[in-house]
């Protein structure tokens, strides 16, 4: 599957990536300069986004349209299964490459970015790490080429940040598990062909009694709730999953009974790198929009960029963006080196999401009235940015994660 992406990027990229030369980069502080292979990948994804996403992003947002054709093309390029090994039909790349690609896709369309992020990080990620060989063949390979996508069902109407308080239950009956309960805010839900679901199998053990399951969609006993009418990322669907005596085979248990909370937390660590990358794309698009407008808009006889106040705004925007990008790359590199990265992924997600919100806000300020109308994309960037501070752990949760790791390091 990676062949199309590598061919699009050029022969030298293909040869280098196949030889895994890019793995030599991954000494975390070795360099902040991307190797040539990753630079070529970035350009390939930027070209795709400029051609396939930018021209239709406003329409997708306005009409709440899922980008079916574009997602299929992304699958053919390997963008929906970037760190999945080639023997499972994935692209076989690393998480740094994934972060770079996701930023560029999100720069073109944030909704398409989150569709890509959920399939890579939240759906394929836990199956790749915890699934059996048979599960990987059944639940990963068909989801790599864009024909099918998956979703991730953890949050519930009564608990979002408190992931260990699952009220959805799963009980054993013969050769089956029977699921009951409701999952909320599930991205990709209306288009998904499968989901990773977390349910309590032993309530007396609290979070140690949570297990993870693989559920095909559609399936008897599983109903989709209404599509939520959202502030932003409108081209991606969000809905509840309602389980009413939903029966699945016993072999659809992911990992061991009681491993669900561990699986969820480790998956969110990966997912936060994805959301940080999505936020970077929104932030970069906002900065691009602001600079382009300020260069061409004249006031007091000169372009806005000649005004010191505008220059200060642009400098602060660039500083926040570059700082968050380096944090995100560091988290990705740590993961690629099989080092702990929970704190670093939380830092990246927090910094990038807050940067995206702040930068998109300042972009509207620079555009003035033009920033408030749909004729310009700045207002869409602002709406899209806001969710990055909420899903896959709010900013408040990220601060708790960071502080917890920080304090433990001082006590050890």
Swiss-Prot record:
Modified residues (N6-acetyllysine): 51, 72, 129, 208, 262, 292, 306
Keyword Ion transport: no
Membrane-traversing stretches: none
Pathway: Lipid metabolism; mitochondrial fatty acid beta-oxidation
GO molecular function: acyl-CoA dehydrogenase activity; FAD binding; flavin adenine dinucleotide binding; protein homodimerization activity; short-chain fatty acyl-CoA dehydrogenase activity
Modification Phosphothreonine occurs at: 27
Record GO cellular component, one term: mitochondrion
BP GO annotations: butyrate catabolic process; fatty acid beta-oxidation using acyl-CoA dehydrogenase; response to glucocorticoid; response to starvation
Location(s), subcellular: Mitochondrion matrix
Pfam families named among the record's database cross-references: Acyl-CoA_dh_1 (PF00441), Acyl-CoA_dh_M (PF02770), Acyl-CoA_dh_N (PF02771)
Cofactor(s) demanded: FAD
N6-succinyllysine modifications at: 51, 129, 262, 306
Binding note for cofactor: Binds 1 FAD per subunit.
Listed InterPro entries: Acyl-CoA_DH_CS, Acyl-CoA_Oxase/DH_mid-dom, Acyl-CoA_Oxase/DH_mid-dom_sf, AcylCo_DH-like_C, AcylCo_DH/oxidase_C, AcylCoA_DH/ox_N, AcylCoA_DH/ox_N_sf, AcylCoA_DH/oxidase_NM_dom_sf
UniProt binding sites for FAD: 152-161, 185-187, 297, 365-369, 394-396
EC number, UniProt record: 1.3.8.1
Catalytic residue positions: 392
Protein's job: Short-chain specific acyl-CoA dehydrogenase is one of the acyl-CoA dehydrogenases that catalyze the first step of mitochondrial fatty acid beta-oxidation, an aerobic process breaking down fatty acids into acetyl-CoA and allowing the production of energy from fats.
Entry similarity comment: Belongs to the acyl-CoA dehydrogenase family.
Known partners and oligomeric status: Homotetramer.
Annotated PANTHER family: ACYL-COA DEHYDROGENASE (PTHR43884), ISOVALERYL-COA DEHYDROGENASE, MITOCHONDRIAL-RELATED (PTHR43884:SF12)
Protein name, UniProt field: Short-chain specific acyl-CoA dehydrogenase, mitochondrial
């Amino acid at each position: 599957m990676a062949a199309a992406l590598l061919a699009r990027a050029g022969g030298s990229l293909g040869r280098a990536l196949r030889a895994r030369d890019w793995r030599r980069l991954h000494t975390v502080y070795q360099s902040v300069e991307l190797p040539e292979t990753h630079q070529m990948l970035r350009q390939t994804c930027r070209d795709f986004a400029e051609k396939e996403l930018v021209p239709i992003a406003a329409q997708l947002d306005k009409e709440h349209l899922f980008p079916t054709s574009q997602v299929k093309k992304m699958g053919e390029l390997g963008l929906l299964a970037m760190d999945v090994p080639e023997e499972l039909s994935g692209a076989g790349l690393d998480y740094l490459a994934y972060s770079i690609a996701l930023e560029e896709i999100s720069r073109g369309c944030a909704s398409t970015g989150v569709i890509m992020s959920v399939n890579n990080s939240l759906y394929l990620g836990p199956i790749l790490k915890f699934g059996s060989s048979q599960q990987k063949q059944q639940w990963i390979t068909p989801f790599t080429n864009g024909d099918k996508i998956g979703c991730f069902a953890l949050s519930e109407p009564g608990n979002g940040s408190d992931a260990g308080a699952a009220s959805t239950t799963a009980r054993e009956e013969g050769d089956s598990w029977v699921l009951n309960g409701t999952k909320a805010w599930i991205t990709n839900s209306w288009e998904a062909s499968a989901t990773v679901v977390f349910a309590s199998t032993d309530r007396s053990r609290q979070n140690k009694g949570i297990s993870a399951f693989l559920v095909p969609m559609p399936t008897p006993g599983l109903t989709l709730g209404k599509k939520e009418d959202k502030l932003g990322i409108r081209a991606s669907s969000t809905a509840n999953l309602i389980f009413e005596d939903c029966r699945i085979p016993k072999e659809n248990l992911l990992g061991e009974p009681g491993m669900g909370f561990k699986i969820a937390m480790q998956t969110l660590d990966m997912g936060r790198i994805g959301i940080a990358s999505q936020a970077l794309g929104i932030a970069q698009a906002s900065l691009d929009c602001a600079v382009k407008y300020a260069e061409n808009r004249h006031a007091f006889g000169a372009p806005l960029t000649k005004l010191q106040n505008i220059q200060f705004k642009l400098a602060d925007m660039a500083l926040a963006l570059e700082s968050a990008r380096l944090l995100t790359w560091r988290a990705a590199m740590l993961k690629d080196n099989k080092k702990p990265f929970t704190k670093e992924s939380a830092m990246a997600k927090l910094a990038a999401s807050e940067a995206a919100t702040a930068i998109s806000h300042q972009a509207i300020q620079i555009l003035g009235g033009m920033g408030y109308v749909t004729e310009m994309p700045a207002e869409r960037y602002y709406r899209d940015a806001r969710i990055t501070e909420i899903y896959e752990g709010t900013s408040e949760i990220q601060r708790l994660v960071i502080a917890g790791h920080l304090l433990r390091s001082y006590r050890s």
